Amino acid sequence: MKVRPSVKPMCEHCKVIKRKGRVMIICAANPKHKQRQG
């Protein structure tokens, strides 16, 4: 999980979701692409 000030999808499999008011990226194809904002 990367924590970054700005999160962007890294590949076509990355999905942008919101959990508890936080913007997150989850990726089924490459778990290294997981990110959280803040």
From Swiss-Prot:
The entry lists its GO molecular-function terms as: structural constituent of ribosome
Q: What are the GO cellular component annotations?
A: cytoplasm; ribonucleoprotein complex; ribosome
Q: Where are the transmembrane segments?
A: none
Q: Which domain of life is it from?
A: Bacteria
For this UniProt record, give its keywords in alphabetical order, as a comma-separated list. Answer: Ribonucleoprotein, Ribosomal protein
The keyword Ribonucleoprotein is assigned to this record:
yes
Q: Which family does it belong to?
A: Belongs to the bacterial ribosomal protein bL36 family.
Q: What is this protein called?
A: Large ribosomal subunit protein bL36
> Species name for this entry?
Latilactobacillus sakei subsp. sakei (strain 23K) (Lactobacillus sakei subsp. sakei)
